[in-house]
Amino acid sequence: MSRINKFVLTVSLLIFIMISAVACGIYTQMVKERVYSLKQSVIDTAFAVANIAEYRRSVAIDLINTLNPTEEQLLVGLRTAYADSVSPSYLYDVGPYLISSDECIQVKEFEKNYCADIMQVVKYRHVKNTGFISFDGKTFVYYLYPVTHNRSLIFLLGLERFSLLSKSLAMDSENLMFSLFKNGKPVTGDEYNAKNAIFTVSEAMEHFAYLPTGLYVFAYKKDVYLRVCTLIIFFAALVAVISGASCLYLVRRVINRGIVEKEAIINNHFERVLDGGLFFSAADVKKLYSMYNSAFLDDLTKAMGRKSFDEDLKALPEKGGYLCLFDVDKFKNINDTFGHLLGDEVLMKVVKILKSQIPVDKGKVYRFGGDEFAVIYTGGTLEELLSILKEIVHFQVGSINLSTSIGVAHSNECTTVERLKMLADERLYKSKKNGRAQISWQ
């Protein structure tokens, strides 16, 4: 695995871990808050029920203080008051009842009478208290409030309704669990199993006088929590994969662009990046181009220099091609007769002619110094090369006729580059010996 792939994999893994941890952490905190909100809903529900029960008691007390009624008159007054102010159906299932030490009277006339059951269960009939009472296979929370020294009102609320009302006030109620235990046995609420619950909170609630005594258990459904966390992890993995693939694509594009720019500069194709690139600005490219020219090009003729020649000559046996060595005939006499300025013009003219004839991908022109030149030709036949070289055998600069002597050798003729260079030099000498202004290749 390459360093790039390892880097991208590490980044993707970090993205996955970060998203999973943060998202699951936020979701976990939300679930815990919902469990605590359910606990608060139970407290608020009980408080609301107690307040309404207290209000009903105050109605009875107002009747007593205002009219000082008999028991029959009190009962009629209560029934009239409750007829004018119907109790909320979502709160009360049964009652209220007016009880004393030895008597229980049903306030509402058209309900089933549970007085006998109430008198058997409720022991403290003249002290404000709450508790549980069961009859007809149902369990109720009762709220008992004294209205006189020997009479009290008792209100009943079905535990199932109490549980539903409490959960309806909490968010995400369908996934919350609420159970009430009395003496270790479940009284109401959801069927609680520790294996199926998570973030369980339990409290006796003894410090709330308006709540029936018991163990209140609140929790969240474990399967729902795990399912949501699994979805979060899957989403995090998907984001990590997409991010990793995108990162890998971009990194590879950047690297490939860098390779293109590097090869363009190394191979002297500065025109491809002359306007700047991803890694090199236009100013950088121009500076590199200038440095390249100084190191590899002849300042006067812009032919390749000795360093480039040595490198390309080493590669010639593998590529296969021709080495040509040549110089300008009687160049010293030209300098002495017409001066160095004309001599420079002659040298530049020779290089210009060859560059115009040799395709860039087939060969290069080199200058060693003075009037000594070379051509390495790797892209064509001997006939094509001779056709090109004939352009400089005879040429003119102004009105002056000039010529060159050339020696040509093929890489297949020698086993080493040193011997190849010697063979081309021998054929150059042969051209000079035979009268100059000619090409020798045999």
UniProtKB/Swiss-Prot annotation:
GO biological process: cell adhesion involved in single-species biofilm formation; negative regulation of bacterial-type flagellum-dependent cell motility
Coarse class of the protein's main subcellular location: membrane
GO molecular function, one term: metal ion binding
Topology in the lipid bilayer: Lipid-anchor
Subcellular locations according to the entry: Cell membrane
Lipidation (N-palmitoyl cysteine): 24
Protein's organism: Escherichia coli O157:H7
Site features described as Transition state stabilizer, chain residue numbers: 332
InterPro entries named in the record: Diguanylate_Cyclase, GAPES2, GGDEF_dom, Nucleotide_cyclase, Rev_trsase/Diguanyl_cyclase
Protein name: Probable diguanylate cyclase DgcI
Parts of the chain that traverse the membrane: 231-251
EC number: 2.7.7.65
